[in-house]
From Swiss-Prot:
Keyword Cytoplasm: yes
Name of the featured protein: Adenine phosphoribosyltransferase
Organism: Thermotoga maritima (strain ATCC 43589 / DSM 3109 / JCM 10099 / NBRC 100826 / MSB8)
SUPFAM superfamilies per record: PRTase-like (SSF53271)
Database matches in PROSITE patterns: PUR_PYR_PR_TRANSFER
InterPro entries: Ade_phspho_trans, PRibTrfase_dom, PRTase-like, UPRTase/APRTase
Top enzyme class: transferase
Purpose of the protein: Catalyzes a salvage reaction resulting in the formation of AMP, that is energically less costly than de novo synthesis.
Length: 173
């Protein structure tokens, strides 16, 4: 059924956003309609057996994948944004990137107590963003049932930070 080698559609950008980092650019995959469709279909397959109410995803590329998956799976979508981007009252978490510190914000009423959540993002690198997303979901009373990523940078050992969670990835480096 699935036929594409999706790794072919990921472009390596050396020394971006800073020297020593190899950025895995998914825009060629997004640009190709067959690759994008197959990536979404395959990511949905990764979580077909999980029961959840909402897909939570961070900007920017997480929005693209998360919203598409939420639509395909018939679930609600919750955007998580950088500071100052959401119009209503928010709660936030700080986290470390492999190249700095950032904050993630979510509307304080985005998740109801007890709702089950799938977290979606484009790349699982250090696990810092995923940890912050988990903390946000828990802060609002939600339960993270799974995390799904298009790409995992296994050489950074991100799963160590996510022990105890169901982590699914499509492409592993």
């Amino acid at each position: 059924m699935f036929k594409l080698d999706l790794k072919r559609f990921i472009r390596d950008i050396p020394d971006f956003p800073q020297k020593g980092i190899v950025f895995r650019d998914i825009t060629p995959l997004l640009r190709n309609q067959e690759a994008f469709k197959e990536a979404i279909d395959r990511m949905c397959e990764l979580v077909f057996d999980r029961e959840f109410d909402l897909v939570v995803a961070p900007e920017a590329r997480g929005f693209i994948l998360g919203a598409a998956m939420a639509y395909k799976l018939g679930k609600g979508f919750v955007p998580v944004r950088k500071p100052g981007k959401l119009p209503y009252k928010t709660v936030y978490e700080e986290y470390q990137l492999e190249y700095g510190t950032e904050q993630l914000h979510i509307h304080e009423d985005a998740i109801e107590k007890g709702q089950k959540v799938l977290i979606v993002d484009d790349v699982l690198a250090t696990g810092g963003t995923a940890e912050a997303l988990i903390r946000l979901v828990k802060k609002l009373g939600g339960e993270v049932v799974s995390l799904a990523f298009l790409v995992e940078l296994s050489y950074l050992e991100p799963r160590k930070r996510l022990e105890g969670y169901d982590v699914k990835t499509l492409i592993v480096y």
